[in-house]
């Protein structure tokens, strides 16, 4: 089953957590969830050139805190912070809560599955060979420090009449192992022959402790250049 389900959804509350981190009453839940979807869609369209990986939305009391993880923060911030103020005003129109906007830089985009998938899709839209784009993404990830990566592309590859699926893998990608820290993302390439789907799995190691925040903490430490914390072995204490 590990190969059939979404790797992130399978690991929620094990070593991953949600991108929308708030609780609401039943009468308000639908409206707030719709706000999240609209804000995420707007951010990805507005900052398409900034390399946005994910958008974390938290809702403390009567506030809305939006954190954008991007590979090019300067594109969003703009000269003297002019662009980020414009973005904040546009996002404020989606919610009635007080909006706070934070920008987090991704210093190793080669290890981010969303950015790798979008990079491969953009290369195919520029008519780069899909095999070359896949191999380049895999080699860059392994060179930076990934323990394994798998890339799937599906569609009318190379303009073929019949759609097919091809994949490329290097290293280990243990999808059945719940403690495995696996980043997963999808993207689409719009070509003259139709849409080509891209899927990327990146294996970064194992998280032995049961902590939903472990992936985010490990990711932030890796981006800052600090050594990851050693895993806590609860069984050895017993």
Swiss-Prot record:
Chain segments carrying region Disordered: 212-238
- Single annotated GO MF: rRNA binding
Keyword check for Ribosomal protein, yes or no: yes
InterPro entries the UniProt entry points to = KH_dom (IPR004087), KH_dom-like_a/b (IPR015946), KH_dom_type_2 (IPR004044), KH_sf_prok-type (IPR009019), Ribosomal_S3_C_sf (IPR036419), Ribosomal_uS3_bac-typ (IPR005704), Ribosomal_uS3_C (IPR001351), Ribosomal_uS3_CS (IPR018280)
Which residue windows does the record flag with biased composition (Basic and acidic residues)? 212-222
Q: Name one GO cellular component term.
A: cytosolic small ribosomal subunit
Question: Which ranges carry the KH type-2 domain?
Answer: 39-107
GO biological process annotations for this chain's record? translation
Q: Which UniProt keywords apply?
A: Ribonucleoprotein, Ribosomal protein, RNA-binding, rRNA-binding
Described purpose of this protein according to its UniProt entry? Binds the lower part of the 30S subunit head. Binds mRNA in the 70S ribosome, positioning it for translation.
The protein's matches in PANTHER family, at most eight in alphabetical order, are given as: 30S/40S RIBOSOMAL PROTEIN S3, SMALL RIBOSOMAL SUBUNIT PROTEIN US3C
Q: How does it assemble?
A: Part of the 30S ribosomal subunit. Forms a tight complex with proteins S10 and S14.
Family per record: Belongs to the universal ribosomal protein uS3 family.
**This chain belongs to which protein, by name?**
Small ribosomal subunit protein uS3
Q: Which organism is it from?
A: Cereibacter sphaeroides (strain ATCC 17025 / ATH 2.4.3)
Q: What is this organism's lineage?
A: Bacteria, Pseudomonadati, Pseudomonadota, Alphaproteobacteria, Rhodobacterales
């Amino acid at each position: 089953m590990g190969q059939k389900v979404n790797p992130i959804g399978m690991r929620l509350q094990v070593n991953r957590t949600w991108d929308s981190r708030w609780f609401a009453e039943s009468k308000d839940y639908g409206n707030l969830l719709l706000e999240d979807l609209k804000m995420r869609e707007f951010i990805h369209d507005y900052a398409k050139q900034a390399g946005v990986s994910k958008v974390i939305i938290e809702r403390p009391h009567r506030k809305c805190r939006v954190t954008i993880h991007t590979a090019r923060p300067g594109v969003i911030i703009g000269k003297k912070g002019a662009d980020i103020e414009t973005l904040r005003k546009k996002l404020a129109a989606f919610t009635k809560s007080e909006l706070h906007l934070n920008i987090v830089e991704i210093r190793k985009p080669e290890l981010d599955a969303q950015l790798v998938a979008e990079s491969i899709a953009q290369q195919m839209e520029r008519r780069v060979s899909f095999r070359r784009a896949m191999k380049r993404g895999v080699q860059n990830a392994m060179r930076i420090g990934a323990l394994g990566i798998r890339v799937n592309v599906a569609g009318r590859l190379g303009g073929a009449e019949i759609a097919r699926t091809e994949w490329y893998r290097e290293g280990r990608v243990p999808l059945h192992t719940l403690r495995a820290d696996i980043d997963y993302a999808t993207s689409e390439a719009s070509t003259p022959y139709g849409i080509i789907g891209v899927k990327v799995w990146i294996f970064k190691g194992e998280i032995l402790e049961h902590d939903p925040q472990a992936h985010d903490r490990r990711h932030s430490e890796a981006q800052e250049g600090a050594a990851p914390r050693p895993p806590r072995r609860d069984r050895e204490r017993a």
